[in-house]
Regions:
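P-loop NTPase motor core
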Residues: 61-126
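Walker A/P-loop-proximal flanking segment of P-loop NTPase domains
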Residues: 1-80
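Short regulatory helix/loop adjacent to the ATP-binding pocket of P-loop NTPases
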Residues: 212, 225-243
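Conserved P-loop NTPase "ATPase switch" module shared by AAA+ and STAND
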Residues: 169-193
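Conserved P-loop NTPase mechanochemical-coupling segment
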Residues: 10-14, 18, 101, 108, ...
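Conserved small/polar residues in nucleotide/adenosyl-binding loops
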Residues: 256-258
Length: 258
């Protein structure tokens, strides 16, 4: 009797899919396209169930320092040895999803956003070891981990984390933001849109604009929020939607996969 490959229904974690032998539609060509079609800030908008979150998980696994390179064996990107040697496992990565910022008030939404930053900061606690960071740096890091930050600190939190990671690793930082538009959509539904736009715009501007610690960033979402709303003044900002041919094979499924 033929052995069937398991389908990863509802699984959006690249490492789990590869380790547990689930069927994986190879989208690692996205890595090559991102690096060849360089943009410092890259926004991808696609409908739900188009593999955005899985692609972000895959990008994190590829670039992050300490990655298990065997996860990519046999996949398209592994054929590009020069690219893999230069980029695989070579960068600190900040990876957050804003999917959970779903609240009925601005105060609750802000608290949820703070929690997301706290949890991501905890993932990088290794930077507290050794003496690469001074006492001031470590105090800044602890404020992120403990959530001891007002709104003025929150809007600089991701930029602060990139600076700390760059100082520790002596490498520029890759930033991945999944479901970037959820806080804005929920704010619009619940009557605090203007406040949320200001918070998200300040957060994004600080981490994505004139940030010397940033290597590049990728954002994904379902909605194309007007650039004037939250991406004001960003240079080298690229957007790609379902209507664009570029990257059309790296999101969703084609007929040969169905």
């Amino acid at each position: 009797m033929a052995e069937f490959i398991k389908l990863p229904v509802g699984i959006e974690n690249f490492e789990k899919i590869r380790r547990d032998g689930f069927y994986y539609v190879d989208k690692t060509g996205l890595i090559e396209q991102l690096l060849n079609n360089w943009g410092e800030v890259n926004l991808f908008t696609r409908p739900r169930r188009f593999g955005k979150t899985l692609n972000m998980s895959m990008l994190k696994c590829f670039f992050e320092i300490g990655t298990d390179q065997s996860l990519f064996e046999g996949l398209y990107i592994s054929k590009n040895k020069a690219l893999c040697d230069a980029y695989m496992g070579k960068y600190p990565v900040i990876s957050i999803s804003l999917k959970g910022v779903n609240a009925d008030s601005y105060e609750n939404a802000r608290s949820l956003l703070k929690r997301i930053v706290m949890e991501e900061a905890k993932m990088h606690r290794i930077i507290m070891s050794g003496n690469r960071l001074d006492d001031i740096d470590k105090a800044e890091y602890m404020s992120l981990v403990t959530g001891d930050m007002g709104e003025d600190t929150l809007v600089y939190s991701m930029k602060t984390l990139t600076a700390l990671l760059e100082k520790y690793y002596e490498k520029k930082v890759i930033v991945l933001i999944d479901e970037y538009d959820v806080p804005l959509a929920k704010a619009n539904e619940n009557g605090y849109y203007d406040q949320m736009v200001l918070l998200v715009r300040n957060l994004f501007e600080n981490v994505l604009k004139t940030n010397s610690s940033l290597k590049f960033a990728v954002l994904t979402g379902c909605l194309r929020v007007a650039k004037e709303s939250i991406f004001t003044g960003l240079n080298n900002f690229k957007t790609n939607s379902i209507l664009d041919e570029e990257y059309d094979e790296t999101f969703g499924l084609s007929l040969i996969h169905i």
